[in-house]
Amino acid sequence: YSYMQGFWEGMGLRTTMNTRVTLSDLRRMNKYDLCILSAHGAYYTYSYGTFRKHTRTEPIILLTEASTLYKDIIYGFDLLAHRIIKLNGLYCVTADFFRNAYRSGQLSNTIIYSETCEFLGVTNSVDESMAEALLAGGARTVLGYVNNVYTVYSRSMLWDTVNHLAMGQTIGRALAHAKDTYGENDIIWYTEQGGRRPHAAAAYLVLYGDESARLNVPENFSLEERAEAAEDMLADVLESAA
């Protein structure tokens, strides 16, 4: 990610990287044109209720923020409403967290790109609640995966998509280029790399919202010049890796 950040900065994108995202950070995504959620995720079943137990299954995003008594008091209403849950002492968020945090539509024009596993559920149980909550909060476009995704495939798709966004392309065209390059799903990519034991269900990236969304890239040089700059930087990477 540090390399990606430097590369994108070189293409004119002001980039902020946060490796210790907190619940408070997730309430401030409206500050950015593009938010990339790179964390563990799961289509998770949990129990709730003191006297009468209930279960619920839905996509969650796992944070590295540890639960404390003080924080539990601050987030008390969110915990009671299951907008936040706890797993192994760490906070996780459900779709209702975003629906509540951005209930006034503050995410206006933001593109949300999630790398988390099972952001949209799993095969035969596709769950669009995360995407729906973010779109309801004003997000212009939301992208996320169905099923568990191979990390290298996910990083490659992100890399290619954002590079082409930085060149001035729409999110729809940028995503199409990434899929043409790395495959419609991660098993296609895996087998093309010579893999022989793919996981059970292919992960694939789905776009919701406006396919014509773009980043507000600097206008100090043209699309052609931006593409040439990207190609030069990629050539430098390949040369250094050779």
Enumerate the predicted regions with their spans.
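A domain-level signal for caspase-like cysteine endopeptidase catalytic cores
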Residues: 1-82
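Solvent-exposed, well-ordered amphipathic alpha-helical segments
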Residues: 5-9, 108, 242
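Polar low-complexity intrinsically disordered regions enriched in Ser/Thr and small residues
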Residues: 44, 52, 79, 92, ...
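Catalytic cores of nucleophile-dependent amide-cleaving enzymes
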Residues: 60-156
